[in-house]
Amino acid sequence: MSSVFGSVHILAMIAIQLLLTHSVSSLNLTNAYLHHKCSNTQGKYKQGSAFEKNLNLVLSTITSIGNFRDGFRYTEEGEDPNNVFVMFQCRGDSYWSKCPPCISTAVSGLRRRCPRNKGAIIWYDQCLLKISSVASFNKIDYENDFYLSNPNNMSDRGLFNKETSALLEKLAYKASDRNNLDGKQLVLYAAGEKRIGTKKVYAMVQCTKDLIFTKCFECLEGILRKFPQCCDGKRGGRVFGTSCNFRYELYPFLRNYSNSTMRAPY
C-alpha cells in the first residue's frame, strides 16, 4: 500500500537517534526535530486562499488556547472544499507548560518544511502535529510511520527481544485499558521499566486521544509487530506513527515511570 505522504527512507532516520542526547534533563527540555512528511496527494493551497485563512486561524488558535492540560487537540475550520483539520499530541509526560513550546516549534517547522501543503505531519521528541484537508478523527493512520534505533546491539539478543517485547505489550494493554482514566477521559498512555539481566529497560507507549480504547490497542498492536524490523537486539528503539508510538531505552528518558499518566506539578 502506497503512502499518501510518500516513501520513508527509514535507514536514513537512524542517524538522527545518534544526535539525541542521553541526558534525562536535556531530553525533558528539548523539542528535537525527528521527521516530517509532506502530502503528495492532497495538493497545495494558494496564497490568500480560503484554505490558507482557515489554516492560519486554526494554527493560531491551538498555540494560544490549546488543551495543554491533556496535551491533545483535534479541531477543524471551514467548509468543503476548504476544510482544514489539525491535530496535535504531546508526549505523555509533556503536558501543561511543557506542551506549548513544542507545538509552537512544530507549527513553525511544518510551515518551513511543507510550505503551502494541504496535508503534512511533523514529529518532534515531545509532540506531533498534523494538518490535513481530510478528516481523520478516531481513524487509525496505517500509512505514515517510521522508526529510529540505536545502532548498538545487546549481547543476548534473544532474551532482550523477548523481555522488551513483553514489557511493551504489557504497557499497550495498560494504555488502552478502558479503566485507565484521568477523570472521565481515557489516558491512552503508559510507561514502565523492567530489569533484564544486568540492564534496566525504560519504555513507553502512547495513542492520540481521538482514538477509542479498542482502536488504541489495535494501533499499538500493529506497530509492536514492527519490533523485529526496527529493534531486533537494539539497545534502544522507537516506532512512530501518526496515531500511536512506542519507545524503549536503557536510560530513563521520561520524568516519571511510576504512573500511567504523568502531570506537571502546576
From Swiss-Prot:
Pfam families: Stress-antifung (PF01657). InterPro entries: CRR_secretory_protein (IPR050581), GNK2 (IPR002902), GNK2_sf (IPR038408). PROSITE patterns: GNK2 (PS51473). The keyword Secreted applies. It is found in: Secreted. Keywords: Repeat, Secreted, Signal. Residues 33-136, 142-253 form the Gnk2-homologous domain. GO terms for cellular component: extracellular region. Residues 1-26 form the signal peptide. Belongs to the cysteine-rich repeat secretory protein family. This is Cysteine-rich repeat secretory protein 41. The gene is CRRSP41.
